[in-house]
Amino acid sequence: MNRSRSESLFQKAQSLIVGGVNSPSRSFKAVGGGAPVFMEKAKGAYFWDVDGNQYIDYLAAYGPIITGHAHPHITNAIQRAAENGVLYGTPTKLENQFASMLQQAIPSLEKVRFVNSGTEAVMTTIRVARAYTGRDKIIKFAGCYHGHSDLVLVAAGSGPSTLGTPDSAGVTKNIAEEVITVPFNQLDSLKEALDHWGEEVAAVLVEPIVGNFGIVEPHEGFLEGVNELAHNAGALVIYDEVITAFRFMYEGAQNYVGVEPDMTALGKIIGGGLPIGAYGGRIDIMEKVAPLGPAYQAGTMAGNPASMSAGIACLEVLQEEGLYDELDRKGAILEKGIKAHAEAHGITISINRLKGALTVYFTDETVTCYEQAERSDGEKFSLFFKEMLNQGINLAPSKYEAWFLTIAHTDEDIEKTLQAVDHAFSVMAAKGYHLKR
């Protein structure tokens, strides 16, 4: 597959933009380097790059595009918003309408505030939790990404009762020491951390279903245990549902698992493809937010008519009866086919899937925590990724990321994808990767 124009554009981009990309996840560094593909247009389940190559897309912009690209109901809503002016700096009735839709879908959102990204949403829930509790520390889970604000760019210490260390240059040691990182799905580690630091902990921050080291579901009783342990220590529970809300059902993952947090951060899908974030929770907590309370948060673009219109339209599409069952059906076909081709070629894999999202790990372990996800073979994934790309299948360039199905994917798309999987595994087997466990 010729991608010479992408290569030329990437060379130019590197002279203009840091690293040639505007988000590190778009780089191909994690899959051996080279020029990322420069896309020119997208429609439904497909991308076309600047060289005219067509791809079936499972990146879905890292999750937001559940309706498929350029869904007409959403694009029409954005066009209407543009005609009326995309930014006012004043309240609009669209904000009321969208907030009401979110509250109806996720009842724990007793009050809501719109922001511009998932990073902002998580960052602000932490600030509000600190204001409410009068405490400074938070607990997060290893491998769970919560945006690029300083407080959550923290790696684990050497054990559950140790403070974190900066995971990025520019994050100060003092900030990192306000974060305790423990393994996902391990209540004993959380209990140990709370026993040690509990009186200083403002909140426990968790993805109710992990989306950032692949799709990983909580063990039975884990989230109930998180709530009990946190509340017994006087801490709040914050769910990061930036990836998970409206991904698996027309609600939050909290509705799917049957456990409610004190606060929730949202993003991605709720914007219909435009920049957005939102956070909300119990009234008594949310009343700590300015102008009612002392926790300040503001934003010029927050609640802008374009993002509100796109979000409303997206949720209207997702209310279609049977939509999530169909995503589940397609996901099951894809999972079954990938496993069958892997077995046929002797390639060792493990798949985690929930409805229309799945992750293929090159490991013989069932992945339930970040440590296991780390052991997925990056060399094998890199070869698989490149072979799939050359067969016209667009995946995220990272062994940790999920494949996201959209409502636009057809059975024919899945069959073509599985043909590409068969080819990729055959190449891997020919190179001896079937012998490497």
From Swiss-Prot:
Matching SUPFAM superfamilies: PLP-dependent transferases
Reactions accelerated catalytically: (S)-4-amino-5-oxopentanoate = 5-aminolevulinate
Record keywords: Cytoplasm, Isomerase, Porphyrin biosynthesis, Pyridoxal phosphate
E.C. numbers: 5.4.3.8
* Residues that bear N6-(pyridoxal phosphate)lysine: 268
Main location per the UniProt record: cytoplasm
Q: Which domain of life is it from?
A: Bacteria
Q: Which CDD domains match?
A: OAT_like
Q: Where in the cell is it found?
A: Cytoplasm
| Gene Ontology biological process | protoporphyrinogen IX biosynthetic process
Keyword flag Cytoplasm: yes
Q: Where are the transmembrane segments?
A: none
Q: Which PANTHER family match?
A: GLUTAMATE-1-SEMIALDEHYDE 2,1-AMINOMUTASE, GLUTAMATE-1-SEMIALDEHYDE 2,1-AMINOMUTASE 2
- This chain belongs to the protein called Glutamate-1-semialdehyde 2,1-aminomutase 1
Q: Which organism is it from?
A: Halalkalibacterium halodurans (strain ATCC BAA-125 / DSM 18197 / FERM 7344 / JCM 9153 / C-125) (Bacillus halodurans)
